[in-house]
Swiss-Prot record:
Its job: Exhibits S-adenosyl-L-methionine-dependent methyltransferase activity.
This protein's record includes keyword Lyase: no
Any one GO BP annotation for this protein: methylation
Keywords from the UniProt entry: Methyltransferase, S-adenosyl-L-methionine, Transferase
EC nos: 2.1.1.-
Annotated positions binding S-adenosyl-L-methionine: D129, D158, L159
Protein name per the record: Putative S-adenosyl-L-methionine-dependent methyltransferase MAP_4064c
Family of the protein in this entry: Belongs to the UPF0677 family.
Gene Ontology MF term list: methyltransferase activity
SUPFAM superfamilies for the chain: S-adenosyl-L-methionine-dependent methyltransferases
The protein's enzyme class: transferase
Amino acid sequence: MTVPNDDTWGPATSVGTTATMAAAARAIATRDGVINDPFAEPLVRAVGVNFLTRWAIGELVASDVDVEGSPWGLAQMPASIAARTRYFDEFYADAAAAGIRQAVILASGLDTRAYRLDWPAGMTVFEIDQPAVIEFKTTALARLGAEPKADLRTVAVDLRDDWSTALATAGLDSSKPTAWIAEGLFGYLAPEAQDGLLDAVTALSTPGSRLGSEAVPNTADMDPHAARERMRAATAKWRDHGFELDVDVISFAGERHDVGAYLQAHGWTTVATPMAELLADHGLPAIARADDDRQTMNGVTYYTSTLGTGRQR
């Protein structure tokens, strides 16, 4: 990872581009009737990254820019993003049904759950992300005439800064259960920052709180040069179309704690769902296998965790 600690971004640059790519995949999955995110395509258009806009609206076909059979291409993204979208949608529906009335979306990006989910009365949704990302999405959705279906509190702060204080200032009541999600986030945090975020979530949570998270595997023993070259070869045609996303620059490798085990050690109970199982559960196509699936979405695991009464501070 070479991004400096003081780097910032919007939805068209650096890490923010990955949020726009995910929104483009949601736009395709929406058009295919797999999920329903009516704001995904308009937001991608508003960001203005030509490659992603063309893909989102169907002008660019994945087979035109993917290496045939590659597990790293665009072709697998709509299904995998749709599966995780359903997972976290259902996570919030279950949390609300259990009486939780505070939701926190960490690194919210172009997430539109505050606007598209049917929240119960009294629900407060907190979105945390970079100031430029928050400002862009809020402005773009207002121009579309979209209105949140819950009490939406935007928290414009970098997760590398004191976001806990900013969240409390925005009105989070840590004496009441909270439903948190960390979707598409941990791969862009250093291993120690991942632990720090989980510690902060635990400190701000009361028993009965829930956390939905997307966990990436350990890659400490991988040859970083070989991994980088495999990714660059798989995305070579993207660059031919004017789009380059150097995942090696914006993501972190290294030895990570297993998210499920780490949370259990801090008082949470966890239920794990591997990506392959999630895709199968929703009748979605499997992702092509790789020599080492830790570099693909096949290596991702989803956790639903609940904080018990014996948590470890």
